[in-house]
Regions:
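Core catalytic lobe of class I
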Residues: 1-191
Length: 191
């Protein structure tokens, strides 16, 4: 995960469970203030244990240049984990979804955001990642959901959304598409 040189940032925890615990605490506040018939749409990708990630020095991303390489080499190795090994896919999305479910959220759906134009990855020992999870969570078993407003042209929308990342004139490879929050907001609100 990217490091922004802020002691209070999320994502630099030693273990994924610590990250999930912090996010769970934050999202329980969302649960507290959400209307009883409201929906909470959570987009989260996964990470590999021991990955040293990128760095942001306050002005520039130095993920892939020579400085970024030096930075990654200087970062401390993660502390030993009870079962995750270096290069293991951590499983953060499902850890978080199940943690929220245990705390009282209704886990209604796991939507796959398929990215037809995924960010390039410099890996040779696995396939490149091209999807993220979007979890639909609610406070109550009955909630507002307008399936018609997000329907596809000829059918009800499925749980795999093929949506390109957005384009950007600047050097940013993973711009979040506005279509995803638009669909979530439209499906979950009456206005």
């Amino acid at each position: 995960l990217r490091d922004y040189d802020d002691a209070d940032q999320l994502g630099q925890e030693d273990h994924p469970e610590e990250f999930v615990e912090k996010l769970t605490e934050i999202f329980m506040e969302v649960h507290r203030v959400l209307k009883d018939d409201g929906t909470f749409w959570l987009n989260i990708g996964d990470t590999y244990f021991g990955a040293k990630g990128g760095h942001f020095d306050g002005a520039n991303s130095i993920t892939n240049d020579g400085t970024g390489t030096k930075y990654r080499e200087s970062r401390k190795a993660p502390s030993k984990h009870p079962y995750l090994k270096t290069k293991d896919l951590s499983g953060v999305p499902w850890m978080l979804a199940l943690s929220l479910q245990k705390k009282g959220w209704y886990l209604r759906q796991d939507i796959i955001w398929h990215k037809p134009n995924p960010m390039p990855e410099a890996v040779n020992d696995r396939c490149a990642k091209s999807y993220e999870h979007i979890f639909l969570l609610t406070k109550k078993p009955q909630y507002y959901f307008n399936a018609e407003v997000i329907a596809e042209e000829t059918r009800r929308r499925t749980d795999v959304w093929s949506i390109n990342t957005a384009s950007c004139k600047e050097a940013h490879f993973a711009v979040f598409p506005t279509k995803i929050p638009e669909m979530c907001i439209n499906a979950g609100t009456k206005e």
